[in-house]
């Protein structure tokens, strides 16, 4: 009883910052006004004379920034947008030398959002050729049982296969139901970073083959420190490697690796030949969309908060996807000035330019 009481007291001392809109679905039409209520509470009670930093405005382009003291721990404010998009409110409260944060985003006519990126004329040709060229390299797979990860229902392996060229390999964790049979399959694609992978054992236990891939061409069962060292060293900022050359851009081989992973599933696992899915979040959300768009074997896909989308939006002062390639450029004219001259075959204004050509996909039917 004493421990329970003490625990309750500790939890009751928590500082909580909330930001809430005046609509339950957080959705408005352009031109309408959203009302937000900010509250800073301690032990469930509004905190008097609390200092806060406030930032509000369009996502990634907040134009209201203030520091103020909330006498009664609460604040009401309004926001509106003339263009479809998202309005964000961020609040940081300063209490006893500590910072406590709250945030809220409201959507304005989100169904009317339009992409800024233009489909390159040679997009389909570029990717079809790249995939065909990669398939000239045999998968030449390897497979190693991981007994410490196996369960009574699932066998777990570290596998690898050649990707875009000989000796460049993709490593992954393969989970296969123990029971003999043909199964649906799920490709899991990763968010940004460098890390080991455990495999999706649970989904496999429910009767599906799962293949969780890494994208960096290194084994996925080493100690975490190895990945930290690589991420802070050779692979720091890998998402920007060779971004001016669509044939050498880091994500070209990553996307091709996803397609080769499907090839591996089709050829080397007891896949049923019918149900094939792909899923991932952030960077993995992008890879989910790209894989589903480029390979018609995919029958279901589940992207979660996809990154790497609509990069050129930032040239119009509108929120774009991570990693915000052009955020430091103020306008489309500045972007054009940074590109080669029109006579250059790598001219960024041409339909098949690298900045447009690497992150597109066929329309999903």
Give the location of each predicted region.
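N-terminal cap/lid segment of alpha/beta-hydrolase-fold proteins
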Residues: 22, 26, 134-180
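Cap/lid segment of the alpha/beta-hydrolase catalytic domain
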Residues: 195-259, 264, 312-322
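Short beta-strand element of the alpha/beta-hydrolase
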Residues: 172-174, 182-192
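Surface-exposed, short loops/turns at beta-strand junctions within beta-sandwich domains
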Residues: 80-85
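Alpha/beta-hydrolase fold nucleophile elbow
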Residues: 271-281
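Hydrolase active-site cap/lid region
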Residues: 285-334
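Proline/serine/threonine-rich low-complexity linkers at boundaries of modular beta-sandwich domains
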Residues: 9-17
């Amino acid at each position: 009883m004493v421990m329970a009481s003490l625990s309750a007291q500790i939890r009751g001392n928590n500082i909580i910052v909330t930001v809430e809109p005046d609509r339950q679905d957080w959705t408005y039409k352009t031109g309408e006004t959203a009302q937000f209520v900010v509250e800073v509470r301690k032990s469930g009670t509004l905190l008097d004379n609390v200092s806060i930093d406030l930032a509000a405005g369009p996502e990634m382009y907040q134009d209201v920034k203030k520091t103020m003291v909330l006498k009664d721990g609460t604040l009401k404010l309004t926001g509106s947008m003339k263009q479809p998009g998202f309005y964000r409110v961020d609040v940081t409260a300063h209490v006893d030398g500590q910072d406590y944060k709250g945030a809220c985003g409201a959507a304005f006519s989100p169904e009317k959002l339009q992409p800024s990126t233009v489909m390159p004329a040679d997009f389909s040709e570029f990717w079809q050729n790249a995939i065909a060229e990669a398939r000239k390299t045999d998968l030449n797979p390897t497979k190693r049982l991981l007994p410490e990860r196996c369960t009574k229902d699932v066998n777990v392996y570290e596998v690898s296969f050649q990707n875009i060229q000989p000796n460049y390999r993709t490593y992954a964790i393969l989970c296969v139901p123990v029971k003999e049979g043909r199964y649906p399959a799920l490709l899991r694609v990763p968010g940004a970073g460098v890390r080991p992978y455990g495999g999706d054992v649970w989904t496999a236990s429910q009767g599906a083959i799962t293949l969780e891939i890494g994208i960096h061409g290194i084994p996925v069962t080493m100690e975490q420190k190895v990945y930290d060292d690589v991420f802070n060293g050779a692979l720091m900022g890998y998402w920007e490697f060779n971004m001016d050359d669509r044939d050498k851009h880091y994500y070209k081989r990553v996307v091709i690796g996803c397609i080769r992973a499907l090839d591996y599933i089709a050829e080397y696992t007891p896949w049923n030949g019918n149900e094939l899915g792909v899923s991932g979040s952030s960077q993995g959300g992008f890879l989910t969309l790209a894989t589903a768009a480029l390979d018609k074997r995919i029958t279901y896909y589940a992207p979660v908060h996809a990154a790497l989308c609509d990069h050129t939006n930032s040239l119009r002062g509108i929120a774009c996807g991570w990693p915000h390639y052009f955020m430091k450029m103020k306008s489309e004219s500045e972007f054009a000035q940074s590109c080669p001259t029109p006579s250059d075959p790598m001219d960024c204004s041409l339909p098949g330019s690298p900045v447009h050509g690497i992150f597109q996909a066929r329309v999903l039917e």
